[in-house]
Amino acid sequence: MAKVKVTLIRSVTHRQPTQRRTVKALGLGKLHSSVILPDNAATRGAIFKVAHLVSIEEVK
């Protein structure tokens, strides 16, 4: 199964509460923190909601 590396590149300060919760649900905390997540529809949907705050890389 494919995986994606998600990195928080923009701060969640002054963002809507739903965006803050989405970032936390992805497992991201501080700036430049990264997590490797499975590439499925639920993960892609969460990433889409905060795409302007994170960077995405495909991991093999």
UniProtKB/Swiss-Prot annotation:
UniProt keyword Ribosomal protein present: yes
One CC-aspect GO term: cytosolic large ribosomal subunit
GO process annotations (BP): translation
One Pfam entry name: Ribosomal_L30
Residue runs in coiled coils: none
Record's signal peptide: none
Any GO molecular function: structural constituent of ribosome
Keywords: Ribonucleoprotein, Ribosomal protein
Quaternary structure annotation from Swiss-Prot or TrEMBL: Part of the 50S ribosomal subunit.
UniProt record similarity statement: Belongs to the universal ribosomal protein uL30 family.
Protein name: Large ribosomal subunit protein uL30
Organism: Limosilactobacillus fermentum (strain NBRC 3956 / LMG 18251)
Phylogenetic classification of the source organism: Bacteria, Bacillati, Bacillota, Bacilli, Lactobacillales
